[in-house]
Amino acid sequence: MAEQNAVATQQGTQLSVAAQVKSMISQDAVKKKFAEVLGQKAPQFLASITNVVAGSAQLKKCPANSIMSSAFVAATYDLPIDSNLGFAAIVPYNNSKYNPQTRQWEKHPEAQFQMMYKGFIQLAIRSGYYEKMNCSVVYKDELVSYNPITGEVEFVTDFSKCTQRAEGKSENIAGYYAWFKLLTGFRKELFMTTAEVENHARKYSTAYRYDLENNKKGSKWTTDFEAMALKTVIKMLLSKWGILSVDMQRAIQDDQKVYDEDGEGSYGDNQPDIVEAQDPFSNIEQKEEEQQIGGLDLEEVE
């Protein structure tokens, strides 16, 4: 009986969050805010928020304000939030907070805005500084040499003799590669071995470490390692060597920011240089009272 009540409560909460998001989207004040940054594309983008929430049981555990705020960040970059497209995503994340009353760390499900690798490439293209750019998985039979000191990478000249890419086996992946060429002629490349990317993920993602230690699948690094690896190399390449437009600088700061129930943005997954952000929906009265979300663990993927 207790289990049935718990399931019913969880389903009620998820329905409530979905209803809250739908209610907020229908408000004139919200429509106006999105129209200010997206123009005529705003209605289509708002509809996509509903679809994203409907397709994720984990997002339905997050506060509606958190979801809407993350979506608004994506809207300011004019990037779609369908994670399958690879530009940007709204990802559920367990943000640990200290409760002074219980003197314990407690997990709070929140929505996290994430730039994906195609999103960084898109913003770079829009800047008008870049002539060419790409990032790719590199298989072992495609790599001739890599010098970690100079950063120089040499690939085979005849890819027709390489077979591992067609096979697509992860154990044959040597690493991940990104490069760009500016209109000025300046060219830069970055290669990271699979081990280097793995170490990067372990260092900067508490969610990924939790997954590895507890055999879970709640982190984007666990469920889509390749996409996160490509994002890592292109982001590191651009942030170190690229010409960053204002939007690119903002995107690097906003990437993986989570929003709490008070509408404040912070980095919840080992991200440095915390920047506070105002919730654009904090002054908009919701038609439905938000229900308290407790006892839910995003690491328990359904």
Over which residues does each language-model region extend?
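Binding-interface segments
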Residues: 13-244
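Glycine- and charge-rich intrinsically disordered segments
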Residues: 1-32, 248-302
